[in-house]
Amino acid sequence: TNAPTPETLNYLREGHIDFGIVSTPFPERPDIQMIPVREIEDVFVAGRRFFSYKNRTLDFQKLESLPLIFLEKNTSSRSYMDEFLAGNGVYVQPEFELATSDMIVQFVRRNLGVGCVMRDFARDYVESGLLFELRFNKMIPKRQFCVVRNTKMPIAPAAEKLLEIMELDAAVATV
């Protein structure tokens, strides 16, 4: 399934899936096992319409005056960014709230606003010069992709083996 973190966690709790891949942060529960597998970074990207901001160091307050493109509110990524910005005294009202990060990148490519996405979603466009990342005077803290499973539910043998392999890979990657 391809769903926001809260929805994926519900599927897991209800036994509809053996495991899921979600992004932090999310509420920890004793019955949910979490295996961090990859670090992720949130960035703000823009196209030529916002070229005057390229290579400038901005304050997060500037976001309040820009047309923003965010994920919908029912995602952990959106909640994380809203909380991070609020912690810095910044409150935004996005022009567009979209279902996927791929859609955000496409809206940004068409110069409809400044998008907030995980770096990987915009990497190819940034490397090709079609988009650029806004720079800020403070870093946005990194997050994690995690594999999660419900320890109170039985798991299919194939899913169990895949999780074992992922745990080994994650352990090797941190050595």
Language model features with spans:
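Hydrophobic residues within well-ordered alpha-helices
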Residues: L12-R13, L63, Q106-L112, V147
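A ligand-binding cleft/hinge motif common to bilobed small-molecule-binding domains
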Residues: T24-P30, E83, G87, D102-E133
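Secondary-structure junction motif
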Residues: S52-K54, P67-N88, I155-A159, L163, ...
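Central regulatory/effector-binding core of bacterial HTH transcription factors
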Residues: T1-R29, L98
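Short beta-strand->loop
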Residues: Q33-V43, S128-P141
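A late-sequence structural motif
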Residues: F132-T174
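Flexible hinge/capping segments at coil-to-helix
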Residues: D31-L68
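A local structural motif
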Residues: A86-F96
